[in-house]
Amino acid sequence: MKMILDLDTGIDDAFALAYAIAHPGIDLIGVTGTYGNVTIEQGMANTQALLTLLGAADVPVYAGRAIDGFEVSEASARIHGRNGVGEVDIAA
């Protein structure tokens, strides 16, 4: 099944992305980035780093619509960390 994921890649979406890549019945044809747990820019950076880590760097990542003045809520930052993935440096 072809799939496009729309993510604000925090911890929860990192698991969804890994599952989609690992599932033999899913053909991940793209990811769009949105805001929520993190900004679009941070989410896209997280997504691209995870795709590389998981051996799927060829999956295209597209930015969704940004919203002016969006800031990550304190609750999201406490749950997901400022970078959305618990302050883990995925690229390391």
From Swiss-Prot:
<protein>
    <recommendedName>
        <fullName>Uncharacterized protein in ribF 3'region</fullName>
    </recommendedName>
</protein>
<dbReference type="Pfam" id="PF01156">
    <property type="entry name" value="IU_nuc_hydro"/>
</dbReference>
<dbReference type="InterPro" id="IPR036452">
    <property type="entry name" value="Ribo_hydro-like"/>
</dbReference>
<dbReference type="InterPro" id="IPR052775">
    <property type="entry name" value="IUN_hydrolase"/>
</dbReference>
<dbReference type="InterPro" id="IPR001910">
    <property type="entry name" value="Inosine/uridine_hydrolase_dom"/>
</dbReference>
<dbReference type="GO" id="GO:0016799">
    <property type="term" value="F:hydrolase activity, hydrolyzing N-glycosyl compounds"/>
</dbReference>
<comment type="similarity">
    <text>Belongs to the IUNH family.</text>
</comment>
